[in-house]
Swiss-Prot record:
Protein name in the entry: SOSS complex subunit B2
Phylogenetic placement of the source organism: Eukaryota, Metazoa, Chordata, Craniata, Vertebrata
DNA-binding region: 26-99
InterPro entries: NA-bd_OB-fold, SOSS-B, Ssb-like_OB
GO molecular function, one term: DNA binding
Amino acid sequence: MNRVNDPLIFIRDIKPGLKNLNVVFIVLEIGRVTKTKDGHEVRSCKVADKTGSITISVWDEIGGLIQPGDIIRLTRGYASMWKGCLTLYTGRGGELQKIGEFCMVYSEVPNFSEPNPDYRGQQNKGAQSEQKNNSMNSNMGTGTFGPVGNGVHTGPESREHQFSHAGRSNGRGLINPQLQGTASNQTVMTTISNGRDPRRAFKR
C-alpha cells in the first residue's frame, strides 16, 4: 500500500493518537534547537494550513534544512500529546518533502498546539462530545476565518500571506487573551489585536 497517495488531512482534523498522517503545511517559525541526552537535535516548528496551526517536532539534520516559508508535505506522520500540547511528529519511515515556497493560504489561529483544558474534557467524554464540538465548529475552517478577517489586513505589520482572525470562534479560553495582548515580541499578535475594532465595524 502506497501511503504517499493516501488522502491529505487538515491540521484541524489532527487528534492525539492518529498515525500515518499526510499533511501539507507552510512553515511559520523555527524554534530553538534542543539536544537530547543521546546527542540528537530537536526543533519545534510552528506550521499552518488554511484551518489552523500546530507544532511539529523535527529531529536532527532535517530540522536544519527547514526554513520559514517552506511549503512541506509530511507523509506517515503521527500526532501525540507532549507536555499537554498536541504535537505532530514525522515518525518512523515518515518523510518531509519540500513542495514549494511562500504561496499558500494559511491561518495561524486556532493554534491546536496551545494547552487547552477543554480538550482534555472532550477526550474523556468520548466521541459524542467530539461530534457535538465538530457540529458547532462546522463553519469554522475557511468559512469563519475568511469572513471574520474579511481579507483586510490591519496595522503596518501586515504580511502578504493571507491569514485571518478567529476572535471567539472556538470558545477556547487561551486564544482570546492572546488576541487582546499586545506583547512587543509577538508581531503577529499585534496585528491580530489591531483587528478587533474593524471586526466590530463590519458587523454594524
